[in-house]
């Protein structure tokens, strides 16, 4: 299983290994070599049908569920290094039916220490389908792969001087994740 990521504002994609997938809300203990954590909020989908070079008019046939999550990046390093740290792809389950995205009142929110640091409505279905098509140009999509689209630029989340932070996320007023980053 791959986690295929489309960086914010880019047409290209890269893959994260499945060892980065965190689905149990476990706290992240920062390795000694990492002094800062960066992050990006994402919308993601699970691929439900294998495909290669998917035509945009058929993209909706290749996924059956969606959700929102968080990607963490270790330090301000190259993507290949910073995106491979274990438990840094916070892509929660269960996933929602794509129809939920059509209601713009459903909000995805991320909180750091109880303060909102990101909030968005959910009208991104076209971006999701475009990302599936672009990802399938570079790699063969398999059932179970995740396609994640960054919803903003990567930005600083926490530094070693903070000691510990709590990060929470919700969608449709339901809790998606709640964990700490501990330095």
Label the predicted regions.
Residues 1-146, 153-183:
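Catalytic-core "active-site belt" of small-molecule-metabolizing enzymes
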